[in-house]
From Swiss-Prot:
The name this protein goes by in its record: Global transcriptional regulator CodY
GO terms for MF: DNA binding; DNA-binding transcription factor activity; GTP binding
A Gene Ontology cellular-component term: cytoplasm
Gene3D superfamilies referenced in this protein's UniProt entry, alphabetically: 3.30.450.40, Winged helix-like DNA-binding domain superfamily/Winged helix DNA-binding domain
Keywords assigned by UniProt, alphabetized: Cytoplasm, DNA-binding, Phosphoprotein, Repressor, Transcription, Transcription regulation
Major place of residence: cytoplasm
Organism: Bacillus mycoides (strain KBAB4) (Bacillus weihenstephanensis)
Superkingdom: Bacteria
GO biological process: negative regulation of DNA-templated transcription
Residues with PTM Phosphoserine: S215
Chain's gene name: codY
DNA-binding region: 203-222
SUPFAM superfamilies, per database record: Winged helix' DNA-binding domain
Record-stated family: Belongs to the CodY family.
Length: 259
């Protein structure tokens, strides 16, 4: 397969995504096919975002690593020393993707390390490995193109996470600001009583202890529930089951108490 055809195959994957998140596993499968190598997309913390195997490596440690989808911490950290594409590294290299305990079996093993960079930040590493055949310029062009695509996708996911976090926080702040002083006081006592993200409480007991009416507690819970911050369910004589749905809620509540 010529370089142009291989590039088109990678482009076809991106075009088929059509604005949806690119699946790192599918991306790895396509890279594996066009570069004809084992492919590992490794995050900053060593998590395997995606991988595909071209040549099976019979080694228990490698099998466990793939099953756990996690590269060893020491190896992951060492990858940060590679700041530009390093190709055709032998099995004696610190960066080899082949099991060092079986060097004699993988004497022809070659590894290529491609940093994944986006927004001026190291986002991860693309690790390629194969036996015998050297990685040529065409392979490296495809690898660097792929690492750019992966970097853009990681940045997009990070931006979405930040946006979602900001949205969750805004919802919580609006919900809390909608509470009256007595309702806020009631909520603070309720979650002191729960001491966690879910549990049972008896509203009348809290009302008596704090010196507020039961209706204040009910109204406060309704406001938070309508905002999607909590879920509550009456269990009759047992009390009310409450579960926090927005993980920013308890953080914001704690901030209010310290201010």
């Amino acid at each position: 397969m010529e370089l142009l055809a291989k590039t088109r195959k990678l482009n076809a994957l991106l075009q088929s995504a059509a604005g949806k998140p690119v699946n790192f596993r599918e991306m790895s499968d396509t890279m594996c096919e066009v570069i004809e190598a084992n492919v590992f997309v490794v995050s900053r913390r060593g998590k395997l975002l995606g991988y595909a195997i071209h040549q099976q490596i019979e080694n228990e440690r490698m099998k466990h690593m793939l099953a756990e989808r996690q590269f060893p911490e020491e190896y992951t950290q060492s990858l940060f020393n590679v700041t530009e594409t390093s190709s055709n590294l032998g099995v004696d290299s610190d960066y080899t993707a082949f099991p060092v305990e079986n060097r004699e079996l993988f004497g022809q093993g070659l590894t290529t390390i491609v940093p994944i960079v986006g927004g001026g930040e190291r986002l991860g590493t693309l690790v390629l490995a194969r036996l015998g055949q050297e990685f040529l310029d065409d392979d490296l062009i495809l690898a660097e193109y792929s690492s750019t695509v992966v970097g853009m996708e990681i940045l997009r996911e990070k931006a979405e996470e930040i946006e979602e976090e900001a949205r969750s926080k805004a919802v919580v702040q609006m919900a809390i600001s909608s509470l009256s002083y007595s309702e806020l006081e009631a909520i603070e006592h309720i979650f002191e009583e729960l001491n966690g993200t879910e549990g049972l409480l008896v509203a009348s007991k809290i009302a008596d202890r704090v010196g507020i009416t039961r209706s204040v507690i009910v109204n406060a819970l309704r406001k938070l529930e309508s905002a999607g911050v909590i879920e509550s369910r009456s269990l009759g004589m047992k009390g009310t089951y409450i579960k926090v749905l927005n993980d920013k809620f308890l953080q914001e509540l704690a901030k209010l108490k310290t201010n």
